[in-house]
Design a protein with these regions (language model features):
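N-terminal chloroplast transit peptides
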Residues: 1-22
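Active-site acidic/histidine proton-transfer and metal-coordination neighborhood
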Residues: 212-236, 240, 244-254
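A glycine-rich phosphate/pyrophosphate-binding beta-strand-loop-alpha-helix module
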Residues: 188-210
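Conserved, mostly hydrophobic/aromatic
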Residues: 97, 196, 237, 279
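Structured alpha-helical segments in the cores of large, soluble enzyme domains
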Residues: 176-193, 217-233, 259-270, 300-310, ...
Length: 335
């Protein structure tokens, strides 16, 4: 006795007849899909990022990403330019000379057990070509010293921001034009990754960040990431929304989701190999002048919400920057 299945009309059909009909439909669908794919061009700008990279290059990028994203460790940002670090030296009575900057970096890099807590260090280009004069590492460039210690050396390759005309003071970063040449020099000096920062402010009254501001900055980050991987460096992309303003936490979540969604789509559209890239983003917070107070748990949940909505699981790790917050607040919100 043949079995029967209930059809959508309530009548019955023999199972074998249904299977034959479904098989014909499946074969027709497969032919249509093959025909559609035959007319499409899936080049390096498809969603299969990294098609232009060799398997060896991909493996190298992933390996560096895994080292940087090691559990229980963090990235130290030592990429202040001479002017910025000079103000800090002067605050403690030191003259801002290249030798004092070098000695300060050496003290940080060669501190006992630094590699237990740090996975990577972001350097200013000046620091790449400075040498240690310690007994253990005498004469070695700082990138080599860091590598020997077990800390991955990287570099800040971007230049300065300039204002986007007609965008209420919103900015975009300079440095893409000469990026490939400089990145090759930095790699030759011992760097394994680079970090590009795109700063933005939330200014609800002036409509910032506008679509133009977001798209301009995120497209630059995507192109930077593509160039990095072509040279052989892991790109860390840093969309940095500042704490300026009086916006609430809900507004911060909405805008950060939009920014990161535009960023990750741009990276895919550019053909960036997502497994060989890392995110370094601001911690999602209300504006410093917000009239409403939020708990640590509410802010932590807001950050998780942003990741749940847009973070690509192909990426090995996401890293927070703590700028604008006290160490105690940043640690509590991260924990």
């Amino acid at each position: 006795m043949s079995q029967t299945m209930l059809s959508c009309t309530g009548a019955t059909r023999p199972t074998s007849a249904l299977l034959r009909r479904e098989n014909r439909r499946t074969q027709k669908t497969r032919r249509m899909v093959r025909a559609a794919f035959a007319t499409q061009s899936f080049g390096p700008c498809s969603c299969h990022g990294g098609e232009h990279l060799s398997d060896e290059r991909k493996a190298e990028l992933v390996s560096v990403c895994e080292q940087i994203g090691a559990a229980g460790k963090g990235i130290t940002a030592c990429d202040e330019g001479p002017g910025t670090i000079g103000m800090r030296l002067e605050n403690v009575g030191m003259v801002n000379t290249e030798e004092n900057r070098r000695a300060y970096r050496q003290m940080l890099f060669e501190a006992p057990n630094a590699n237990k807590y740090l996975s990577a260090a972001i350097l200013d280009p000046e620091t790449l070509y400075q040498k240690s004069d310690s007994q253990k590492h005498n004469g070695k460039l700082f990138p080599a010293v860091l590598s020997e210690i077990g800390i991955v050396p990287g570099v800040k390759p971007h230049l300065k921001v300039y204002a986007l005309p007609g965008q209420s003071g919103a900015t975009v970063m300079q440095g893409l034009d000469s990026l490939a040449v400089r990145l090759q020099e930095y790699k030759d000096a011992g760097c394994k990754f680079a970090k590009w920062r795109s700063p933005m402010d939330i200014d609800v009254a002036n409509g910032q960040p506008s679509d133009l501001t977001i798209e301009t900055n995120m497209l630059d980050l995507a192109r930077y990431a593509l160039i990095c991987q072509d040279v052989g460096l892991v790109p860390i992309v840093e969309p940095d929304v500042s704490l300026k303003g009086d916006h609430d936490l809900e507004t911060a979540v909405r805008i950060n989701v939009k920014i990161q969604s535009v960023l990750f789509k741009a990276m895919l559209d550019h053909g960036v190999y997502m497994e060989g890239a890392l995110l370094k983003s601001n911690m999602v917070n209300p504006g410093k002048n917000c009239s409403k107070t939020y708990t640590v748990d509410e802010i932590a949940e807001a950050n998780l919400e942003v990741f749940r909505r847009c973070f690509p699981t192909a990426m090995r790790s996401a890293n927070y920057l703590s700028g604008g917050q006290s160490l105690e607040d940043a640690a509590a919100r991260l924990d």
